[in-house]
Amino acid sequence: MYENLKSLGIQEPTSVDSYTLRQEANHDILKIYFKKQKGEFFAKSVKFKYPRQRKTMLVDSGTHEYKDVTEINANLKYVVDELDNLTQGVHIQADPDIKQKILRDLRHLEKVVQNKISEIERDLEKL
């Protein structure tokens, strides 16, 4: 059982506490956290980087337009399935991180747009 995790070098899959999965450019980053042992200040973790699989898909059959898309690596799917069985959904903790990043990006965008509007208004006043 848990052959995919063992192939990654995780000899004791039952020691897995949680995991996060995120996408960076053309890679998926899987970080696995282990249960904290007595006397440890921080739980141990390991990180794995998987290239995303590229596919060319037909978008419009009338114009024969194709689009390049990426999707999760097939091996990573199996690893995530095993991690889900072990953690029973504990990986959900990564969602607030994503939400916070999106909120920070949104606030930054608001500032950029507001500064641009102010700049355009100043230019208009000069006319």
Curated annotation (Swiss-Prot):
NCBIfam families: PRK13677.1. Belongs to the UPF0325 family. This is UPF0325 protein ASA_3165. It comes from Aeromonas salmonicida (strain A449).
